[in-house]
Amino acid sequence: MKTTAFLFACVMTSLPVTAAEASEPSSGALQTLNQQAQALDRLHTVVVAYDGNIIHEHHQGGPGVAAPANVKSLSKTVLAAVTGAAIEAGVIESVEQPMVALLDSVPSAADPQVNDITVAHLLAQQAGLERTSGSNYGAWVASAHWVNDALTRPFVDRPGGRMLYSTGTSHLLSAALTQASGESTLALAQRLLGEPLGIAIPPWPQDPQGIYFGGNDMQLSPRALIAIGELYRNDGMADGQRVLPEGWVEDSWTPRGQSPWTGDGYGFGWFITTLAGEHVAYGRGYGGQALYVIPEREMTVVITSDPTPPSPGGQFQQQLNALVADLLAEE
């Protein structure tokens, strides 16, 4: 187990906040955070950044804070950032662009409603297609063609309707990025996100056609996740360079649907909630992977945990939320 507290300069400039609302967590609050973390056997790391600096790192298992870790479905939040960067770079026109305009082809067996699905619907998990997650996940990843399998599933709601959390929907976004750009999603992520942030984005699994898995199994270090959170906290700017389109963060943190499990809002790859009275945007992944941004407190928090089965269930995510809430509430 290793805990360090220090200043680590990040490259993003700060959004203006009211000074009275933004105070650095005290040493006592961080000590309490460590104690609470140690009580959670699955938890591996906790990293806290304040005002653009990493002020606290705690490691008690698994890969260290600088080592890549499987972030599971937190990959959906990262893929959303890649999509925003692709729009800023002109690879995609806008979130209103139809998905089919970006794909090389659509199977003839697909419902005509697929023509109504936009990039925004993919980002917000509102494609309307039957989910490939949950009980459908095993059959989907065992299929010979993940993209076609997702596209030919029946519609259970209209495009733009209720949130239907589905990794297949995110995978369609990865396919759209690849086929629209002529680059792999990995190459796009490295060029448009990794390079401006100065972070490593290693290869992760691909489908049978070579499309990088959209929305699962990316490998990123906790420090890299902090950099992505800080990019959002600073309105898409990194070291004076615009990486995400102007207004992207506000759009991403505007709820378009609602989680059927927690009731939290969901925007473009981010859940929206309130912890200790503070507005919080967060991404999450199976087993206890989480990235929190608390803009009014100038804070970004990353938590990684054991990603292997069995699942600790929703209760573990509630415990992670409670860790962050207690940190925010501590005077």
Q: What residue spans do the PLM features occupy?
A:
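Bacterial N-terminal signal peptides
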Residues: 5-16
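Active-site-proximal alpha-helical segments within enzyme catalytic domains
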Residues: 169-176, 216-237, 289-305
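Structural helix-adjacent loops and short alpha-helical linkers that scaffold large soluble proteins
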Residues: 90-94, 133, 178-190, 236-244, ...
